[in-house]
Amino acid sequence: MDTLTPKRRAIFEFIRERIAEHGQPPSLADIATRFGFASRSVARKHITALCQAGYIDVTPNQARGIRLAEPLRRPEILEIPVLGQVAAGAPIGPDLGIHEQLLLDPSLFRRTPDYLLKVRGDSMIDDGIFDGDLVGILQQADARDGQIVVARLDGEVTIKRLQRQGGTYRLLPRNPAYAPIDVQPEQDFFIEGVFCGLLRRD
C-alpha cells in the first residue's frame, strides 16, 4: 500500500474509528465537517486517493459506501505488548519497558490496541476496570469528552474518564472514594491514549 500524507492518514483513522464505534462509516459530509473542508468534493478527493492507495473500498452511489479494504480487517490473532502499569488511583511514575507479548483474540477489544497496561488501584471499578486488569490502549494524543484515557500528569501516569470543559481538563475517577483531578494550567499534561477494552486474567 502507498504511504499516506498526514491529512489522509488522519482521515483514514477517522473512518476506521467511526466504523469501530458506530458500526458504519462516515459520510462525505461527516468527513468535510470533521476536517473543516469547504465542500464534500474536497472530502471526495481524499476518499478517492485512499481508495487508490488500497486502504479503503468504496461502493458507488451510496451515502455511506466506504469500507475498509480486505487487508486492513482484523487478523485472527493479535500480538500486543504489555508496557507496564497504570494507576487507577493516585498517578504513578511511568513504567514503559516491554514486560511481555500476549497473543489475543481481537474480539476482546472494540478497536485494535497498540499496547496493554496493567491496572494498579480501584478508582475505575464503576466502569468495570479492576486492580490487576490489563487495559488495551489505542495510542493517540487527543480524546473526546467522556472517553476513558491514559493521561500523563507531571510525569506520572493514570487512567481516568476525561471531562473537557472549554479549554480545561478534569480526570474523573469511577469510584466515589476518590476525588476528581483538576488539571491546572501550569501542570505538564497530555493524553497518551484511549481505552479500547480489557483482559482479565485469573
UniProtKB/Swiss-Prot annotation:
Listed EC numbers: 3.4.21.88
Top enzyme category: hydrolase
Catalytic activity: Hydrolysis of Ala-|-Gly bond in repressor LexA
Location of the DNA-binding region in this protein: 28-48
Keyword Transmembrane listed: no
Keywords, alphabetical: Autocatalytic cleavage, DNA damage, DNA repair, DNA replication, DNA-binding, Hydrolase, Repressor, SOS response, Transcription, Transcription regulation
Gene3D superfamilies: Umud Fragment, subunit A, Winged helix-like DNA-binding domain superfamily/Winged helix DNA-binding domain
Gene Ontology MF term list: DNA-binding transcription repressor activity; serine-type endopeptidase activity; transcription cis-regulatory region binding
Active site, per annotation: 123, 160
Example GO BP: SOS response
Pfam families: LexA_DNA_bind, Peptidase_S24
Top-level taxon of origin: Bacteria
SUPFAM superfamilies hit by this protein: LexA/Signal peptidase, Winged helix' DNA-binding domain
CDD domains the UniProt entry points to: S24_LexA-like
Any one of the GO CC terms: protein-DNA complex
Signal peptide: none
Site (Cleavage) location in chain: 88-89
Function: Represses a number of genes involved in the response to DNA damage (SOS response), including recA and lexA. In the presence of single-stranded DNA, RecA interacts with LexA causing an autocatalytic cleavage which disrupts the DNA-binding part of LexA, leading to derepression of the SOS regulon and eventually DNA repair.
NCBIfam families: lexA (TIGR00498)
Protein family membership: Belongs to the peptidase S24 family.
Complex formation: Homodimer.
Protein name: LexA repressor 2
Originating organism: Pseudomonas putida (strain ATCC 47054 / DSM 6125 / CFBP 8728 / NCIMB 11950 / KT2440)
Annotated gene: lexA2
